[in-house]
């Protein structure tokens, strides 16, 4: 551990998603904790908003306020601020300060006045913005108190916690400030709405576009934070260009994202996990498809994509086009393989499709009936073997009661249907306008019997409480064969990295931070199970063809080749461990400590 003495710096990491799960930054902060604790020890502390529902599950208050963080919390409370100090209940158990944004809502008028008066940052009455500004004001007070007691490096993540930075600099509070943008706010909006985003990036009028999308206050905070930080960072080389043209500052360094990688000592361990979870996916697939038509599960591969519903940004459009081409090619080649493709995202729905639930219930009834018949046959066969002098195998049907024969027949009769398996598992609120469904219907990729590519669109995240899968998302990933994430806009991209960490091959794109990092730092990455689609230099049609080629190559692998590739992917995961990537963070902190206060 490098920093241990009371004279060495204290690191404060401030994030809206510390002990408050909203999106991907929660994964960044949480997974990094063990490596941060190992390096910084007791001089590391997080700051996040107090959200009672989240805190009830993940926060444990302390009675010990003897360290500098605890003392600063007591002083802040004495000023009338509702704040808590304790432990975040995640791996590493770091110290954390939680501050209730609502305890400063009575000061919002004054906060907004001075933001405009001193920094020309406009505001609105939007609820999230009010919370962010109130939280920021209290964070500024906390840091001002803490900076009187110790040397402090304060690392702010994203615009939601960026509002204190301009005033910390204006008031010359003795703190070294690092600010990280994980994705520029304007970049995300422009990429979703402008097909020529990357070509026109150099000529964007940020203020005009921010007003157009009604996000000028947030973008103004982001820009002020970027310019006010002693050290400005972003998560990938892909977003560096965005920062230059949309925030008007070149990042000082890049902080790539990692994971807390759990390596297996023996290769067969993660292979066994793949088989275990694949069997659970088999069960769902049998219930969903076999009612209409069966196919050979030994010749079936499971592909998936997941993430927030941004049809174009996440590359759902490219994935669908490539799947349609793959289906055509496999049919032309008379392939005996089947691809089941899962789209796991979040869209508004009324309920799970009753037909899907009914099919699952019938499948369970078939299983119960077969188990009962198996038990009855087993017991009677054992008795017959023990008492009979004949060594021939008896007629097994004779050991089944008429009741079970009738129930078996009726169950099978009620099971079979001539309807096609639904492509979507839920009743969507926007069924007619949903972009995934529109593509599937218009291209007739609707689970026809002769389709080699079958679709399961699951508009809800996978969790153990989910009645269709009943498993963790990470278990689902391990049970699949390939993750597909050819994003158009993705500052980093955790989903393919999660695949790699699970030993599952993945498709990414060179427009994502992760894909760009892979191309620049890993030799022969395709051989190691990471396929990078060249979207930067190619148009949509060429990229779709390249993706279809990769998918077909994977389908045509034999089982031994797939296992070998999973071994190579799992071997690659170590280079994305936070213990390897933390050096980038330490470089940023050393850079901040070496800057002058002015």
Regions found by a protein language model. Give the residues of each.
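Catalytic cores of nucleotide-sugar-dependent glycosyltransferases that transfer UDP/GDP/TDP-activated
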Residues: 1-598
């Amino acid at each position: 551990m490098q920093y241990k003495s009371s004279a060495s710096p204290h690191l404060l990491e401030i994030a809206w998603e510390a002990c408050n799960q909203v999106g991907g930054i929660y994964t960044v902060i949480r997974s990094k904790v063990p490596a941060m604790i190992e390096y910084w020890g007791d001089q590391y502390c997080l700051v996040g908003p107090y959200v009672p529902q989240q805190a009830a599950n993940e926060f444990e208050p302390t009675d010990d306020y003897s360290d500098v963080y605890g003392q600063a919390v007591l002083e802040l409370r004495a000023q009338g601020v509702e704040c808590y100090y304790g432990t975040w209940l995640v791996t590493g158990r770091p110290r954390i300060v939680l501050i209730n944004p609502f305890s400063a809502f009575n000061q919002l008028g004054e906060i907004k006045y001075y933001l405009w008066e001193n920094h020309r940052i406009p505001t609105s009455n939007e609820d999230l913005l009010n919370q962010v500004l109130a939280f920021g004001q209290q964070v500024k007070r906390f840091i001002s108190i803490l900076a009187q007691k110790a040397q402090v490096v304060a690392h702010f993540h994203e615009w939601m916690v960026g509002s204190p930075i301009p005033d910390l600099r204006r008031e010359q509070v003795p703190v070294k400030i690092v600010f990280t943008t994980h994705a520029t706010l304007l970049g995300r909006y422009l990429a979703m709405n402008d097909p020529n985003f990357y070509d026109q990036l150099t000529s964007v009028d940020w203020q005009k576009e921010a007003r157009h999308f009604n996000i000028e206050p947030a973008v103004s905070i982001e820009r002020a934070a970027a310019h006010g930080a002693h050290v400005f960072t972003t998560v990938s080389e892909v977003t560096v260009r965005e920062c230059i043209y949309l925030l008007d500052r070149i990042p000082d360094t890049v902080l790539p994202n990692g994971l807390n990688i759990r390596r297996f000592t023996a290769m067969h361990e993660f292979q066994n996990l793949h088989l275990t979870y694949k069997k659970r996916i088999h069960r769902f697939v049998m219930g969903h498809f076999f009612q209409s038509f069966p196919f050979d599960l030994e010749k079936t591969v499971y592909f998936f994509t997941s993430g927030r519903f941004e049809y174009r940004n996440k590359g759902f459009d490219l994935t669908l086009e490539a799947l349609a081409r793959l289906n055509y090619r496999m049919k032309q080649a008379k392939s005996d393989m089947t691809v089941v493709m899962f789209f796991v995202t979040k869209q508004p729905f009324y309920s799970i499709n009753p037909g899907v639930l009914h099919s699952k219930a019938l499948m369970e009834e078939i299983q119960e009936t077969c188990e009962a018949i198996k038990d009855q046959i087993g017991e009677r066969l054992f008795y017959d073997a023990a008492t009979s002098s004949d060594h021939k195998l008896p007629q097994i049907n004779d050991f089944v009661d008429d009741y079970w024969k009738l129930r078996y027949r009726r169950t099978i009769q009620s099971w079979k249907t001539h309807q096609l398996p639904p492509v979507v598992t839920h009743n969507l609120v926007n069924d007619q306008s949903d972009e995934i469904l529109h593509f599937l219907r218009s291209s007739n990729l609707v689970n026809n019997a002769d389709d080699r590519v079958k679709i399961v669109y699951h508009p809800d995240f996978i969790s153990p409480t989910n009645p269709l899968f009943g498993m963790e998302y990470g278990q689902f990933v391990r049970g699949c064969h390939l993750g597909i994430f050819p994003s158009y806009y993705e500052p980093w991209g955790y989903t393919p990295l999660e695949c790699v960490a699970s030993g599952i091959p993945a498709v990414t794109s060179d427009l994502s931070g992760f894909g760009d990092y892979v191309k620049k730092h890993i030799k022969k990455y395709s051989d190691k199970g990471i396929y990078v689609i060249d979207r930067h230099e190619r148009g949509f049609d060429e990229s779709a063809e390249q993706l279809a080629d990769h998918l077909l190559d994977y389908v045509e692998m034999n089982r031994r080749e797939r296992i070998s590739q999973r071994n190579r992917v799992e071997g690659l995961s170590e280079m994305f461990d936070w213990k390897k990537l933390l050096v980038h963070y330490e470089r940023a902190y050393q850079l901040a400590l070496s800057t002058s206060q002015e």
